Each structure stands twice: as C-alpha cells, then as structure tokens.
C-alpha cells in the first residue's frame, strides 16, 4: 500500500492543539501510530519503540523534524482527535485499493474486540461490524455497535459507505433481513445470506425442499469442499439451482 496516499487522507483530520505548543505534526503522529499498530504494537510504549527502531522508514513519508514523539505525547494527541474524521480518512484509504469495477465478494460480519470489556467502569465490550473484501483481503468499511443485536441496524449504515454495484454481499444469519436484501439490490449488488432459526418459516421451507437425502445425492449442480476448522473436519456442500416455485413468493419474516 502507498503510504503517501495515507498521508493525503489523514490530512483532513483537524488538529485542535494550540499551534505554538506543537512540536510534532499530527500527520506524523498518526502515521507512526498506524504503521506501528499494523506491525503488532499493542500499547503507546510499543508505538514509540516502533518509531525509534524505524526512523528512516517513517521519514520517507513524514517530516519528524523533532524526532520521534514519546509515548505520553502520542497517547495525548491520539486521544484528542475526532474519531469520525479518523474513521473516514482510514476507510477512504482502504477504498483507494478497492476497485469499483471488480466482481468482488464482500463479507460482512461482527466481532467482539478481545479485552475491550471494562468491568470496573461498567463498560461493555466493543462490538464492530466490518466489511471485508475477499478479493483484496482488506477491511473496506467498519462501524461500531453497542452489542450484537444492533447488527441489523448497523449493516445498512455500513452499506451506505460502500460501492457494491456488481458485487456479492455475504452475511451470517443475523443479516438475513428483508430490508437489508432490498437495500443491497437498490445499490446494484447481490447477496448471499445464511438462513437459520431466526428466520423460522424460511428455514423450515429450505429444510423441506432440501432434505438429507437430497443433500446426499443432489439433483442440481453441486460442489463440495472439505477442510479442517476449529479442530474438526468440515464438509461444505454447495447446491446451485433456480428458485423453486414454492419459494418464489416466500418472504422474509
């Protein structure tokens, strides 16, 4: 990835510090922080250490006229930036590498950030919904939610950030919702949803249409793959067919 483009995008982030007190440029601090975290840094001191060991690399893209900032300065400055602007600039950087012309498959999924729960402050764990480009192996969109149940309302917001024309959107069963399907189609995309118990009638209809004997001897075009995952052998069977007549008028719950 070109870090020069990153520098262009983070330049939109406003610096609220008093100009006469500024010793390190905001863009330099953010460049250092992003590169360090991508490289595995887990704390402010790690970020400072990364800067001290990679000064020549960082100076290819930033000024760093006064050297590498100390960890206290990095923490203070980063805590004061506008989260929304930082999010916008970072996602735009990712989108630079995501062509609107390719036939990509975008996987949308929610994850809970490890160690983000703070019991002493009664602060729940951070839940994030991400859009992952499988073609480019990039996160091209991300939204924070309060809890997993909010995924249904967060997914449409995430879709607003993306150009999904001609692309396939994949979600788990939580995203199997009529409104989400309609939104994807309106934006020119297609979708592949998982159907489970949260769509009771629809799930039952699929089970009746594709009983176990059909899965063991598919009548339609099919493809099976086997892989090891989570310590077990998994076989995935893909059956491709036109929508059966009995499901054409079947709606989401």
UniProtKB/Swiss-Prot annotation:
It comes from the Bacteria. One of its GO terms (biological process) is DNA transposition. One of its GO terms (molecular function) is DNA binding. It holds the Pfam family DDE_Tnp_1. Belongs to the transposase 11 family. This is H repeat-associated putative transposase YbfD. It comes from Escherichia coli (strain K12).
């Amino acid at each position: 990835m070109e870090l020069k483009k990153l520098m262009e995008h983070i330049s939109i982030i406003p610096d609220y510090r008093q100009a006469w007190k500024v010793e390190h440029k905001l863009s330099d601090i953010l460049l250092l922080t992003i590169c360090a975290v991508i490289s595995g840094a887990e704390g402010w001191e790690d970020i400072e250490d990364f800067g001290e060991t990679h000064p020549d690399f960082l100076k290819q893209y930033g000024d760093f006229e006064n050297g590498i900032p100390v960890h206290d300065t990095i923490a203070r400055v980063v805590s004061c930036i506008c989260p929304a602007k930082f999010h916008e600039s970072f996602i735009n950087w990712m989108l630079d590498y995501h062509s609107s012309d390719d036939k990509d498959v975008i996987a949308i999924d929610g994850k809970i950030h490890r160690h983000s729960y703070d019991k002493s402050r009664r602060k729940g764990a951070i839940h994030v919904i991400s859009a992952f480009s499988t073609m480019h192996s990039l996160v091209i969109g991300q939204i924070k939610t309060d809890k997993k149940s909010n995924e249904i309302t967060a997914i449409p917001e995430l879709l607003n950030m993306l150009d999904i024309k001609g692309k396939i959107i994949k979600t788990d069963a939580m995203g199997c919702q009529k409104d989400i399907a309609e939104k994807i189609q309106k934006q020119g995309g297609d979708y592949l949803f998982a159907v489970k118990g949260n769509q009771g009638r629809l799930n039952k209809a699929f089970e009746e249409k594709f009983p176990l004997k059909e899965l063991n001897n598919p009548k339609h075009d099919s493809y099976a793959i086997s892989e090891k995952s989570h310590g077990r052998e998994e076989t995935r069977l893909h059956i491709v067919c036109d929508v059966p007549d009995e499901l054409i008028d079947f709606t989401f719950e």
